[in-house]
Amino acid sequence: MKWLSRILTVIVTMSMACGALIFNRRHQLKAKTLNFNHKALTIIIPARNEEKRIGHLLHSIIQQQVPVDVIVMNDGSTDETACVARSYGATVVDVVDDADGKWYGKSHACYQGVTHACTNRIAFVDADVTFLRKDAVEALINQYQLQGEKGLLSVQPYHITKRFYEGFSAIFNLMTVVGMNVFSTLDDGRTNQHAFGPVTLTNKEDYYATGGHKSANRHIIEGFALGSAYTSQSLPVTVYEGFPFVAFRMYQEGFQSLQEGWTKHLSTGAGGTKPKIMAAIVLWLFGSIASILGLCLSLKYRQMSVGKMLTVYLSYTTQFIYLHRRVGQFSNLLMVCHPLLFMFFTKIFIQSWKQTHRYGVVEWKGRQYSISKEQ
């Protein structure tokens, strides 16, 4: 069995080498004090039954050091979303129904929201987002100014978890970031065509020139379509990590909501990662199973060193925790038991593949969307 021990050790070593390459570029926001005597930008928040989340976002917006306008686009909410938004001084606009069924997801609400914006700079922010610092909006604007106030800037918020089950989002969040390609030196450095969806910043001129969310009207996950639309007009598209400025808490409704949400994401957003980066990601993830397999076999067969296999497992675990700490705050127990996270990720991936290729339909927030119709 020593030969098997050597093979598994080599596999995990190769896996960790891939792990060192998939997220070895950092793209972080930089803070800078800015002075505005007028509204710095308009924040548009698409919201559907978000009464339990939107208050945290609006409270954090009130704390910002620069003045902003806030528009909440109420997309058919049946709860107290509108009342909560008004209590924080936000302007609430009811989304006009999409009678023809031409729009998917939140794009319809976002596109309508721009017509109510009174500033040239516009930011689209999901209701489950929170600004962690009082200079968060300044950091966003500063970074946008550094790219000439042109194109599209997007941010993947730092993922904060409070309940144990929320930690099962860990691998998905890491894959969301590294799957953007630009965070790895394996990327060929060509123009980025993808954007994160939770926080995006642009200007009206570029937004209308590219078609804005109209270009994503058939996409549940609008970031890729938006990024492609801007790139086609030779406009810059940039992506950044949220920490320490922007965070979110996902799927507070329960474990079922978490499963449905990530099934939706994988159904529509797995095709943008470049092949060599995807290969490195797959090999890195496989290291989770290889490391636990080696440890379990060493406990059964004396020919395999328990100490060696435990060292291999702990080495992989250390890297696993290190990479995930960049994108979120997750349970230490789940981080150590990463094979469970890998198996859950695999389960959702298979479920997503079935919905996409067998049924062609995905459900989210009480609405069904046909994947086959996405352009």
Curated annotation (Swiss-Prot):
Bilayer disposition of the protein: Multi-pass membrane protein
Superkingdom of the organism of origin: Bacteria
Gene3D superfamilies for this protein: Spore Coat Polysaccharide Biosynthesis Protein SpsA, Chain A (3.90.550.10)
**Gene Ontology molecular functions:** glycosyltransferase activity
What stretches pass through the bilayer?
A: 3-23, 164-184, 277-297, 330-350
* InterPro entries (alphabetical): Glyco_trans_2-like, Nucleotide-diphossugar_trans
Q: Name one Pfam family in it.
A: Glycos_transf_2
Q: Which is a GO BP term held by this UniProt record?
A: carotenoid biosynthetic process
The answer to whether the entry has keyword Plastid is no
What does this gene product do?
Catalyzes the glycosylation of 4,4'-diaponeurosporenoate, i.e. the esterification of glucose at the C1'' position with the carboxyl group of 4,4'-diaponeurosporenic acid, to form glycosyl-4,4'-diaponeurosporenoate. This is a step in the biosynthesis of staphyloxanthin, an orange pigment present in most staphylococci strains.
Q: Which family does it belong to?
A: Belongs to the glycosyltransferase 2 family. CrtQ subfamily.
Name of the featured protein:
4,4'-diaponeurosporenoate glycosyltransferase
Q: Which organism is it from?
A: Staphylococcus aureus (strain MRSA252)
